[in-house]
Amino acid sequence: MTSQAIQLIDVNKEYNKESLEYFKQCVGTRDVGFNYHVISVFGSQSSGKSTLLNILFNTQFDTMDAQVKRQQTTKGIWLAHTQNVNNHKSTTDTDSDYFILDVEGSDGAERGEDQDFERKAALFAISVSEVLIVNMWEQQIGLYQGNNMGLLKTVFEVNLSLFGKRGNDHKVLLLFVIRDHVGVTPLKSLQESLITELEQIWSELNKPTGCEETTLYDFFDLEFKGLGHKLLQEEQFYDDVKSLGDSFIDSESNEYLLKPNYHHKLPIDGWNMYAEQCWEQIENNRDLDLPTQQILVARFKTEDIANEAYAKFTEEYETETEKRINDKTELVSYLKKIKDECLGEYDEHASRYAKAVYEEKRIELVDKVNERLFTTASKYLDMLTAVLLTKLENGMKEKENIKLPFEDRYLKLFKDIEAEFDAAITEFFSKDLLTKIKDFELKFAADVHEKKLQLRESELNALLSKIKKQLTLRIKDEEIELLSKPTPDLWDKVTDTFENIMKKTLSRFATGEGEYEFKMGLSEDENKKQYHAIRAFAWTLLETVVHDYLKEDTIVSLLRDRFESKFRYDSNDVPRLWKNEDEIDQSFRVAKEHALEILDILTLAVKTDGTEVIPDAFEDEPNEGLIYDDSHDVYHSNRFAHILNETQKEKVQQQFRRQINVTVLDCKRSIVTSSTHIPIWIYAVIVVLGWNEFMIVIRNPLFVTLALLSIVSFYFIQKFGLWGPVMNVVNTALGESRTTIKEKLRQFVLEEHELKKTAKVEEEIELQDLSKNSSSSGNEDSD
């Protein structure tokens, strides 16, 4: 297949912007890859370059009609595409694509001494081609200008400056095609002459620094082909052309010309951009860094391919990922699929460019894709973490686990959720959806640890609340019982009872003397801290109980009770019966001293060994143990031990004395009352004077019956202690009677009031009538 040629660079030195479209038309939908070759021809004007190309590659370049006029035919640089190479083996198209550059001839009359385009065209051809065909006639060999050796020298110098330090094995094949070789001079002799000239030219080059020892063969390979005379040896000419064509298509032949190191390793669309940039820099007389141009082309094309692949990936990612976020298996599978498709598409089209650039852009593309995948993986793992933390929390509260210590429950459940999280993150990592999992593992561990602290704090608070509740009940019950029955060793009992309550309440947590483990996974210091907090609470509670209970009135009551028990009862708890006031006074003094023995004990918490009761749980509190003043401006050194100050104590004593004095006076009055009894003869007088009344009662059956009923009722009421209910019934009856009487009286008063009011109204009406009558009579008299 051969396409119509286009002008790649016109006479005005402008690069054809439609060239890329031309390449697309030539290639179609085929994936050419690197399976294409660029071949250019270089030589003097009217030397038959276009004719040779048309015969060899079946192209359709314009040719000169020598019978009309010898003149310039090819203007600028033309490009043609072909797959049909003239050869001995086959007349069908080859598998490779050939792009042929027909360069304007040198030394033409049309340009005269303007050799600028010749040099630029030659430099362009050698920069973009794999094979540069140098077309010359046999009779030109040995000439300097005629066989373009001067132009080749210029091209060699520029080429050396461009590629002198490139450090790779890229070369350009200089294929010298000797035209009209009639065979008089052997081809080998002509070849040696040309090689000698070329080596001489190379030796005379101005080599840049670092390239002094380079040779012609470091940059170029040389091949020589002779063609018979086209007119005089027509059959030989065409046979030689086919032999030349064989060397372009038979890759198995030793004479195969298109070696891999001649190729620029750019896909066809990349080659077009590369060629355009090369010409732009050549035309603008810039230093032409061809390797850099190849890299720039590779960068542009690979970036374009990467952007296209990423755009497709993004579209699929944004439309479908959210639907699969709750299903790990489906999510991982889908993310893996779209990532592989994205990278596969990039690899397919970008791997043809420079390997370093391709790999660099691939890394950038992978980073962009992984960034999106990282977002999705993070979201899924955050959701999974929330689910697992909820599972951990619920598992900690399950009945079958609640009996286990906190740390045992936590470790058991943590292993399960950790395994589930590790399985999920490993699946993402194994599918290359996550590049790093350490940060996720650390975040998960931190989240779980934070949840553990929350759960532990919650359970610890619940446990402490339960302990404090038990302490509150026990301290209030047992300590108030002791305070209500004070003894000289009261505070020894209070502190001992306090310690016993603490030990009993915390017995299940005790691990040694003064050592406790609350089974919450706390450190030794943390357990000590919790124990001291509980002990501080207990001491605070005890202080509150003591100070709230031992108020002034309560202490007075305790002193009075202690006085009463000693004053009214003997050592056997038998009530005392006093015969005279001396006995009362003696008992009063003893009972008073007995009661006041505990006054100091109740107002100041001091043990029997003389030491004040000082809580041992407030060592770190700045206010405990310091001098402070109370509401009465009395200073104390310890707020727990000092229950009442001296002023309050004196007030208690005064109230106590007043109350016991009243008690003594009542006792003395009872002695006086019992000593002033009724004389016996009075009873004899009552019997004599009331004998008749007694007899009336005894002889009357009704009175006897009522008397018996009254006596029996009194007996049973007294025996069973029913005076309370009886009095309630009596009081209720009296109350009802009283209410009824009041209601009746109220009605009576109201009725009487209404009657009086009615009578008054009637009287007023009568008076009004009388006044009217009298006035009317007066009027009649006046008339």
From Swiss-Prot:
Pfam families tied to this protein: RHD3_GTPase, Sey1_3HB
Membrane topology, Cytoplasmic segments: 1-677, 723-783
Membrane topology listed for this record: Multi-pass membrane protein
Gene3D superfamilies per the UniProt record, alphabetical: P-loop containing nucleotide triphosphate hydrolases
EC number: 3.6.5.-
UniProt entry keywords in alphabetical sequence: Coiled coil, Endoplasmic reticulum, GTP-binding, Hydrolase, Membrane, Nucleotide-binding, Transmembrane, Transmembrane helix
Catalytic class of the enzyme: hydrolase
Locations listed in the record: Endoplasmic reticulum membrane
Matching SUPFAM superfamilies: P-loop containing nucleoside triphosphate hydrolases
Molecular functions (GO terms): GTP binding; GTPase activity
Chain's role: Cooperates with the reticulon proteins and tubule-shaping DP1 family proteins to generate and maintain the structure of the tubular endoplasmic reticulum network. Has GTPase activity, which is required for its function in ER organization.
Descriptive protein name: Protein SEY1
Organism, as annotated: Candida glabrata (strain ATCC 2001 / BCRC 20586 / JCM 3761 / NBRC 0622 / NRRL Y-65 / CBS 138)
